Amino acid sequence: MVKNGSHLDAETLAMLQNKAISITLPVVYTMVAIISIPGNFFSLWVLCWHIKPKTPSVIFMINLSITDLLLACCFPFQIFYHIQRNHWIFGKTLCSLVTVMFYSNMYSSILTMTCISIERYMGVVYPMKLIKWRRKRYALGACVIMWIFLLLAFYPLESTDLTYEVKELGIITCFDVLKWEMLPNFAAWVAFLLTLFVVLFLIPFIVTVGCYIGTIRKLIQTSSRYGNKQKTRSIYLAIIVLSVFITCFAPNNFILLAHMIVRLFYEGSLYPAYKLTLCLSCLNNCIDPFIYYFASKEFYQKFMQVFRPKVPLSDSLETRRESLFSGRTMSVRSMSSGPMDGLEGVKICLQRQESVF
């Protein structure tokens, strides 16, 4: 962070010349791109063309997969930038676009995983009481609102020239040196950073943890209804999502908060550590397909058909239990409502054939 007319401090100059960062980031981004691009293309293919009907969870997973692929489009620019020792040659407009997409991916992934956890919680703990909220149009609306909110939150990055010419090194940086004028005053900087940390990370993390604890507790209490296989898949899903939060997202967000506190109040810097934690935040692109694997029974079945075709697919007792449960639910809805309500209940319960787990 630099003010008009001031020179970069020694710590920032040292960070821009740090060989560990210039080597580590391109290597990690390349590996993530190699793994995540085919994985997310396969996921998108399965989710869009092989899973019907499109339940709320599927809508959220499609949103997550598209977000991951958009981030993959940013990797070539980031890789070239760091190979060139933090020298940006693509202009200020592309710098802003790549930066916004890079950070939108992380926070969109966080919010989408939170939406999936809420949808799972409603489907397991309150399957009938909250069924009207588990509809496709609400999931689509949530995705649209999510992206509008993110674009508004990152408006300072969208409307500011994020490039900076470092005359001492003869390079032009992209986002590595922020201009103080990006926001009007000190209070605006504090509000911006707290929004990123509290609203886009801390609150979603707490909600996600609470939803999965409630979901797993309910599954354990009603294991005879859902079956051990579905309970196990739900537990695996919870473990993977929480691991992504703790491993991929938490280090970056906590280091960012600590760095900005040190920068704003003590004129120090934790930016090298922050840059390295960006590698961790990108790893979620490789992990997301595993979330789909455990979140959707149909995705799991398609995966097995493609990669393990000789293994017979059989849901046996688990499928019969789920079908029996869906049938009971449908009957109750039909008998307790009017004619149109009964038809709506049948339609909704048919959607339950796509596993709520």
Swiss-Prot record:
The keyword NADP does not apply. The chain crosses the membrane at residues 27-47, 57-77, 98-118, 138-158, 186-206, 237-257, 272-294. InterPro entries: GPCR_Rhodpsn, GPCR_Rhodpsn_7TM, P2Y8_rcpt, Protea_act_rcpt. Residues 1-26, 78-97, 159-185, 258-271 are extracellular. One of its GO terms (cellular component) is plasma membrane. PROSITE patterns: G_PROTEIN_RECEP_F1_1, G_PROTEIN_RECEP_F1_2. The keyword Transmembrane applies. Disulfide bonds join 95-174. GO terms for biological process: blood coagulation; G protein-coupled receptor signaling pathway; Rho-activating G protein-coupled receptor signaling pathway. It is a multi-pass membrane protein. It is found in: Cell membrane. GO terms for molecular function: G protein-coupled purinergic nucleotide receptor activity; G protein-coupled receptor activity; thrombin-activated receptor activity. It holds the Pfam family 7tm_1. Keywords: Cell membrane, Disulfide bond, G-protein coupled receptor, Glycoprotein, Membrane, Receptor, Transducer, Transmembrane, Transmembrane helix. Residues 48-56, 119-137, 207-236, 295-357 are cytoplasmic. Its main location: membrane. Glycans are attached at residue 4. It comes from the Eukaryota. Belongs to the G-protein coupled receptor 1 family. Probable receptor for purines coupled to G-proteins. This is P2Y purinoceptor 8. It comes from Gallus gallus (Chicken).
